[in-house]
Regions:
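A C-terminal functional module that forms or caps the active site or interfaces directly
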Residues: 164-219
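Short, well-ordered alpha-helical microsegments
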Residues: 23, 48-55, 104-107, 168-174, ...
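Conserved N-terminal beta1-alpha1 strand-loop-helix module at the mouth
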Residues: 1-67, 75-78, 90, 151-157, ...
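Short, solvent-exposed amphipathic alpha-helical segments in soluble enzyme
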Residues: 28-31, 56, 112-114, 175-179, ...
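Active-site-proximal loop/turn and secondary-structure-junction residues that shape catalytic pockets
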Residues: 17-19, 43-47, 72-74, 100-102, ...
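Conserved anion-binding
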Residues: 8, 75-168, 181-186
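Alpha-helix-loop-beta-strand connector modules within alpha/beta enzyme cores
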Residues: 51-70, 112-126, 173-191
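Hydrophobic faces of well-ordered beta-strands that scaffold small-molecule active sites
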Residues: 9-15, 37-41, 66-70, 96-98, ...
Length: 243
């Protein structure tokens, strides 16, 4: 499968920004900074401009990879996978974040269709909120992501999304992924206010050599987004140098 994000580590700014002027400023200030590996495009721009137009505007600013996060695609009827993937392919994104919590068939359909279309599926299944799982008062089984990972690997997925807030879970998932996938890529998400830190999460995911971070407000909310991205990348470098 194509590797969308180059290298072994880096920052992927999450462009969940309502104003296009703000988005443009963030991209212009971060696109050439060391360690910025791509961008996550979310629904805020897409609902305003449409997916194809949002991607076009972003392509005018950078040639870095674009990963589309439909907040979160995958928990849907499996037959929607063909339609959804075709539209994303036509819009010229590079990868898709998928949380196929609707069951094994959803994993097969959404991940499988992405691969067949030449898009890279980044598969996850847990978000960093306290009451997501049953043990915290939520509705999802606590081992939902464990089950999704097994099915995703069966479908030849090798890019994964892990929440950054729980060190023990990151260690367990990363070791399992590394033992079952050749040269996997892991993106960690949920930093700052959501409880994750670069230092802790990157050290916890050390079983997987290729580690990236999707970071939103720590970058987009900064008066100097480029400097904020650079600081986070230096934190990554320090973790890997100390390993």
């Amino acid at each position: 499968m194509v590797k969308v994000l180059k290298g072994d580590m880096g920052i992927v700014p999450a462009l969940d920004i309502e104003s296009h002027d703000h988005l443009e400023r963030v991209v212009r200030e971060t696109a050439k900074r060391d360690g910025v590996a791509g961008y996550k495009l979310g629904l805020t721009s897409v609902l305003r401009f449409g997916l194809a137009e949002s991607v076009r505007r972003l392509r005018d600013l950078t040639d870095l990879p674009i990963i589309y996060d439909h907040q979160k695609a995958g928990p849907d009827m499996p037959d929607m996978a063909v339609k959804y993937t075709a539209m994303c392919k036509e819009a010229d994104v590079d990868g898709l974040i998928l949380f196929p919590v609707a069951g094994p068939t959803a994993v097969d359909s959404f991940a499988g269709e992405a691969i067949r279309a030449g898009l890279v599926p980044f598969v996850g299944g847990e978000i960093p909120v306290p009451d997501y799982g049953v043990s915290g008062g939520g509705y999802m089984l606590d081992d939902a992501l464990d089950r999704i990972l097994v099915r995703a690997v069966h479908n030849k997925v090798d890019h994964f999304v892990l929440p950054a807030h729980d060190r023990d879970k990151i260690v367990r998932w990363s070791k399992w992924i590394a033992a079952n996938v050749a040269s996997p890529l892991v993106v960690l998400t949920g930093f700052g206010a959501l409880g994750g830190s670069i230092e802790v999460s990157f050290a916890a995911a050390a079983a997987c050599q290729r580690r990236f971070a999707i970071v939103g407000r720590l970058i987009t909310g900064s008066p100097t987004p480029g400097d904020a991205a650079a600081r986070l990348y230096e934190q990554m470098r320090a973790v890997t140098a100390a390993a």
